[in-house]
């Protein structure tokens, strides 16, 4: 079976919205899942998606959660993800580490929960 990228992304986004995500965060998360599948990393793409929906229903993932900075010193920061969507928390941590590296030459972000 062949599924086109845009169709996959839109379908995943729609499911995320039906499970409590706002449109913007659903779109970003769905894009991450679809991109992983497109890149051949199926374990973080569509194959993971049913488990994510199950985890939302069980309360293991909080669709309203946003990461919070807990501590930082120079180019090193520690964040609490508050059980938010993993691919959104990971993207935020990566972007923050890049920003720290642009300022300091190195950036390290640790994310818990």
Where are these regions (language model features)?
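Generic N-terminal amphipathic, Lys/Arg-enriched alpha-helix
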Residues: 1-19
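Short, contiguous, pocket-lining structural segments
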Residues: 4, 21, 25, 85, ...
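Glycine-/proline-rich flexible loop or hinge segments
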Residues: 13, 36, 73-83, 105-108
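N-terminal and secondary-structure boundary signal
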Residues: 17-20, 35-42
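Flexible, glycine/charged-enriched surface loops at secondary-structure junctions
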Residues: 21-28, 43-45
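Active-site cofactor/substrate anionic-group-binding motifs, chiefly glycine-
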Residues: 47-98
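A glycine-rich phosphate/pyrophosphate-binding beta-strand-loop-alpha-helix module
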Residues: 91-113
